[in-house]
Amino acid sequence: GNSPYTDELLKAAHAPREKTAIPVRVGDPSPIKHVIYVIKENRTYDQVLGDISEGNGDPDLCLFGEDVTPNQHALAREFVLLDNFYVDAEVSADGHNWSMGAYATDYVEKTWPTNYSRRGRTYDYEGSKKISRPTRGYIWDYCARAGITYRSYGEFVGIKDVKPGGGGDADQNLDRAPGPEYFTSEENLQGHFSPIFPPYNLAISDLTRVDRWLDEFHEFEKNGRLPQFQIVRLGNNHTQGTRPGVPTPRAYVAENDLALGRLVEAVTNSKYWPETAIFVLEDDAQNGPDHVDAHRSIAFVISPYTKRRFVDSTMYSTSGMLRTMELILGLPPMSQYDAAATPMYNSFTNKAELTPYKHRPARIDLAEKNPANAPGALRSMQMNFEKEDAAPDVEFNEIIWKSVRGADSQMPAPVRSAFVKVIDDDDHEKEIPRKKRK
């Protein structure tokens, strides 16, 4: 048939052309012992990295370039620039399922359009209903069965008593006793999520989240108990559009960028750095502007074993990133999709370079707030930002576009492309040429 999946892929991935730190067979050893998986929200490649000349970007579509995201630009340049990475999902409802399970169930895929079109369904896609779960669960369930230590920072975690959408006000409540209560409905996350790390809530700064993550990370450095696998959710690059009085889209994205930079700096200066890999992606791309495809997105791999100052244009996906992490941890694939996906071999080498990363300070004012007369302010006030992606994606994207480019600017329509991959007689994948910027 036409499917790239075979049962043999459950035990071993397609072999790379050269040996790297990523094992081929499930269970084979890797010099990487700790994986940190950072999940962000909703940006396309061109929106953030379209201004990097080394990659296949379109600067005309770049909204959050190097002045807004200096850390993501530095990480792409100092480590690996991935300019052909695609998210598997359409929106956050299926995006967090794909990002944690390499699959979204039939229930999720058939019901999220009803929820997103505001026709009466609740958002029950991140652990609140068992029917939305894959049969064998998410990546933490696989870790639990394999005896891999793991911890979630905000992913599939809820918050009980901080009102979302307040534009930073909730930060002031976090340190008040007894403080907000976090919870999870996931059985295998009970006792495995941080009780001090705030989950998704746009009223809480990503810098606060990283402060809380750093508190635990430094404690792990002292006691030697760093989990083998961590999931860290930094989602404020979602933004609240131009809702008056809250951070502008540029400020939200810049805050998120600084938080990521500080996390990477801490890891690369720690005793765990020689055997750690950090993987970063967006859960979905929110149907945003990109000259190749609306699913093309930013992603980063950061490790002593990643190549340095290297452009990797291999076609990768959410499932391929998961497959790479699974191979490092000795986990089997979770679905036919990560089983058949291309692992990120080409981004890695088998020789370590331990040069640490130094975070870049923000270049714009992180306290910049939307004025009452910002383009789309009224519609932004009417949109629901309590859950990620609850706002209509095209309209929300247009508001973000106009907030950066001006009220009279026109956002281009989303691009859809077809992709074909063939496998030659030596079992190596070849990609049909993709769209290049003119």
Task: Report each predicted region and the residues it spans.
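N-terminal pro-sequences and low-complexity stem/linker regions of secreted or lumenal proteins
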Residues: 2-438
